[in-house]
C-alpha cells in the first residue's frame, strides 16, 4: 500500500519480472483518516515509515491497521529509535537527523524515543510482544499483535 503514484512506479518496475504475479498493491493516502487499509493479511510490515509522521498521524495509521487485521496477524515495525542505540554517538546522530528531516521533509519527521512509539502503539489498540535491537546499523524491530 502506498500513494497512487508510487504504486504506478512499482507496477512499471516489476512488469514482466519473475515473481511479479505475487505482488499485490493497493493505492491510498494513509494520511487521510478515512482511507481504509485492506485486511486479511498474516503479517503487516512497516520499515522506516512511521518516523515520517506526527504522533497523531501514527496513531491514526496504526489504529486503522489494528481494525483491519485478524486476531493472529503480526505487525512488524522497524525503526531507528534514538534511545535504543548501542553507541552514544549513534543516538546523537539520530537526534540530529530528526532536526534535518523536520526542516527538510514535511515538518513532522523525527526519530522516535522508544517510549513515545510504544505509547502510540498501545493507543492504537496493539500490544508489543517483542523488541529486537541492533539490527543492521541500529534498527529496532518491534513485533506487535492486537490487544
Question: What does each model-identified segment do?
Answer:
Residues 1-147:
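Alpha-helical subdomain
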